[in-house]
Amino acid sequence: MSVFGGLWRSAVNLCQSSRLFSTGSCARIRMHAIPKLKEVDRWTEKRSMFGVYDNIGILGDFKAHPKDMIRGPVWVRGFRGNELQRLLRKRNMVGDRMMTEDRHNLQKRISHLYRRFNRHGKHR
């Protein structure tokens, strides 16, 4: 029994861990060289426009809201909500102008999400 205990202690000291199970070999990771830094373009359009509309209220007499400056689909601008709410908003805003197949796929997704939200989740 003492032989087993001695082997166990040496194995623990060798790997410097106190696990009761083996995770494979205990070879340490060696870094032979410092990784090279990535070349990052700091003046891409996205990075250069970051924070442009932060002071729109202070500098512009609070006439424009930052959500009015956002470029994108009408039903997404300044909107926070889940996928079902976003799709319902899209259907209400542009549903009558959608192509037949797109509207059909949208309606299928909405009905699927209705079923999912009504069967699962916190608020049932």
From Swiss-Prot:
Instruction: Report the transit peptide positions.
Output: 1-31
Primary residence: mitochondrion
Gene Ontology molecular-function annotations: structural constituent of ribosome
- Keyword Mitochondrion part of the UniProt annotation: yes
How is the quaternary structure described? Component of the mitochondrial ribosome large subunit (39S) which comprises a 16S rRNA and about 50 distinct proteins.
Domain of life assignment: Eukaryota
Q: Which gene encodes it?
A: mrpl51
Concerning its family, UniProt says: Belongs to the mitochondrion-specific ribosomal protein mL51 family.
An example GO BP is: translation
Q: Where found?
A: Mitochondrion
Key words of the record: Mitochondrion, Ribonucleoprotein, Ribosomal protein, Transit peptide
Q: Give me the Gene Ontology terms describing cellular component.
A: mitochondrial large ribosomal subunit
What is the organism of origin for this protein?
Danio rerio (Zebrafish)
- What this protein is called in its record is Large ribosomal subunit protein mL51
Kindly indicate whether the keyword Ribosomal protein belongs to this entry. Answer: yes
> From which residue to which does any coiled coil extend?
none
